[in-house]
Amino acid sequence: MLKLTALVALLLGAASATPTPSPPASDEGITKRATSFYYPNMDHVNAPRGFAPDLDGDFNYPIYQTVNAGDGNALQNAITTDGKGGSRHPQWFASQPRVVYIPPGTYTISKTLRFNTDTILMGDPTNPPIIKAAAGFSGDQTLISAQDPSTNEKGELSFAVAIKNVVLDTTAIPGGNSFTALWWGVAQAAHLQNVRITMSSSSGGNGHTGIRMGRGSTLGLADVRVERGQNGIWIDGHQQASFHNIYFFQNTIGMLISSGNTFSIFSSTFDTCGTAFPTLAGSPWIALIDAKSINSGVTFTTNQFPSFMIENLTKDNGTPVVVVRGSTLVGASSHVNTYSYGNTVGRNPTYGDVTSSNTRPSALAPGGRYPYVAPPTYGDLPISSFLNVKDPAQNGNRQVKGDNTINEADTLNAILELAASQNKVAYFPFGKYRVDSTLFIPKGSRIVGEAWATITGNGNFFKNENSPQPVVSVGRAGDVGIAQLQDLRVTTNDVLPGAILVQFNMAGNNPGDVALWNSLVTVGGTRGAQALANACTNNSNECKGAFIGIHVAKGSSPYIQNVWELGLRDHIAENFSGGTSHRRERWNFGPIRRNATCLYPIGSGHWWLYQLNLHNAANVVVSLLQAETNYHQGANTQQIPPAPWVANVGTWGDPDFSWCNGGDKRCRMGPANFINGGSNIYTYASAAWAFFSGPGQGCAQFECQQTIHWIASTPSNLQAFGLCSKDSVNTLRLGDGTFINTQNGYTGGWTPGGGDVARYTT
C-alpha cells in the first residue's frame, strides 16, 4: 500500500554487465536516408542504445526498428518481431517496448496494420511519412488498429501505444464506403502527437471515420488534424477521454458520440463541418471548452436527454449553437460564455439548463483562454542539440548502464547538469535507470525518453515515511525557469514507504515551461520489481509501497498532460511470479501561487487514500480526471483504510475517514476527488469508477462505494462540472456536509449505475 502523492551514481568500471549487442537482424538491408531528425540519428546498435533489462537475458532485443522508405509491407513485422524469429509478448506494457521509425515516404498497405501493446509508431516531423490505404484494401475496413489483438473486445486492457508525426490517408477508398483510418479502442498510456488524417469526402450520409474510439479507456488525444470524411472522431463505447487541440476540417460530422460516458474537448476547432457535435444515444457528460466554430452548422445537437456544457465558444455564422430534441435552446451567437444543461446542485428542478458568465482569473487563463502547449517534436533541432545520457562521448566520459543493477543517481545528476549547461536535450534511451537517492531535474532541462524510459527508485533513502523523499525532483524550491519532460516512466523497485515518485518544486514564467507530457507513474505489477511483488501478498496486511505518486509542492506550477498514475497493487500486468501489491498512493497538490497548474488530463487509479487531493490548492484547471477506486477496498476489504497508514491530516491533508463508523467498509474507500480548501479550482470532467468491492467481489448498482467525490472544505471559486461516478451511493459530498445522492436526481453517464453532477459552483 503506498503512501504516495501521485508521479533517475556510481562511476562504473571499464567492463559493463550489458553485452554489446549485434546489429538487429531486421535492420539488414535497410537503406539509410539522410534526415536531420534526432531519433534515427541516435546510436541504436552499440552500448548507448536502448536496452530492455527484464527479458530474462535477451540482451539483443531491439527497441528500435525501421523500414525502407515506402515499404508498407514491412511495417507489420517491424511492430511484432522480437528480433530473433518470434513475436513480442502480448499485453506487456512496460518491459518489451518497440519504436518503429518510419522514414519520409508513402507506405501503401492493403490490410490492417495492428499494434502490440507498448508500441510507438514514430514518423519524421521534418517530412511526415504517409501511411495510405490501397484502393484494393481487404479484410477489416480499418487502416490502423492500435488495439492489441490479444485483448479481443476489451480495449480497456490495451495499454501504452502512440503514433507520432504521421499522416494517415484513406483517399483511395471511395468516399461513400464505411472505412476507419484509426481504430483507437485502447486504454491509458496512449497518445497521439502531430498526426494528420485525410479522407475522401462522404457521400449520401455514409463515409470514412478518422478516429473510431470503440470500447476502451483512454485519457487524452491531442494535436490531430482530421480532414473530410463522414466523421472526424466517432466515440463508440469509450469510457472517457479528453481532447486537446483537435482541428476538424470539412467533416460531415466533427465528433459523433453513439456510446460513452465522460468527455471533455478543449482548444479545438470545427472548420466547415456540417454538424460539429451530435450525440445519438445515452447520457454522456460532455464539456466543450475554448472551442471555435468556423463556417459550420449546429454546434451541439442531440435527440436524448443530455448532460453537457459549453464555455467560451466563438462562432462565425448564423446557425444555432444548441438543439435538443428538435428545439433550439441556444440560437445563433458569436460567443457563448458559459451554458450548461444537466443535473445541477442548487437548481429547482435539479435537471435543466443554466446560463452564466464565468470570469477566469488571469493567472489561470491568460487572455481569457486556458493555455495549451503541445509537447515538442524537436524536429527543428539538429542531432548536435541532444545529449544521449548513455554515451560517454557526449556525457562527460561517464558510464551509464540503465539496466537496474546499480545506483546511477549521482552520475545522472551530473549528466543532467551538463546537458542543461550546454542547452542540450537530454535523451534517455529505453532502460531502467536505478536511483538510490533523488534524481534532480535542474532548471534549464529538456528531457525526452525513448519508449517510456524508466527511472526506478530503490533503497533505504526512500523507506522513511516520516521523512519522505522524491525519486525525481523537478527543480528545487524557489527555482523559476524551464524543465520539460516527456515520454518517461517513474516507478519503484521495492516497498518504499517514504518515496515521493515525482515532486514538482519549480515554477515557470510561462505555461508549459515546467511540463510533463505523455508519461507514467507506476508502482508494482510489472517485471523488474520482484522484491515489491513478493513483499505484498497479504490482503489483510497491506504493504506501504510508496508515499506519494506526484506531489506539486508550494510555489510550483506544472503543466501536466496525459499522465497516468497507476498503483498496480491489485493485479499483475505482466506475467511473472509474485504477489499482488497493495499500497497507499495519492496525487497531492499543495498551495500554488504562480500561474496555472494544468492537468490535461490525468489518470489516477487504484491508490489507497484518494486519487487526487487538492489540498489548499490555488489556480488549478483539470480538463479530465480518470479515477478508479482500489479494487481491494469495499465491503470485502481485508484491511480498512486508512490502515495500514496513519493519516497525516495536518501536513499532507490526508483523509482520515473520521466521518465513517469504524467498521463501515463502503464509507472507508478512497475518494476520487478529495478537495480541501483553496481557491480558483476549475474542473470540467471527472470519470470516477468503482469496479469492485474488495478482492473478488463485484459491485451492485449504486452500492459499491458510499461517496466517490468529497469536498472537505469548500474552496473560494470552485467551478466543478461533470463529476461522474459508477456504482456510488453518493456521487458528491459538499463542504457543508450535504450528500448528493446519486439516485435522487443525479443519475447519468455510466449505464447502468452511473451518477452525474453536471454542475456545482461556488
Curated annotation (Swiss-Prot):
Inhibited by glucose. Involved in mycoparasitism, hydrolyzes yeast and fungal cell walls. Classified as a small-oligosaccharide-producing type based its the end products: glucose, laminaribiose or laminaritetraose. The C-terminal cysteine-rich region may function as a fungal cell wall binding domain. Its EC number is 3.2.1.39. This is Glucan endo-1,3-beta-glucosidase BGN13.1. Keywords: Cleavage on pair of basic residues, Glycosidase, Hydrolase, Secreted, Signal. Optimum temperature is 40 degrees Celsius. Inactive at 55 degrees Celsius. Does not seem to be glycosylated. It is an enzyme of class 3 (hydrolase). GO terms for molecular function: glucan endo-1,3-beta-D-glucosidase activity; polygalacturonase activity.
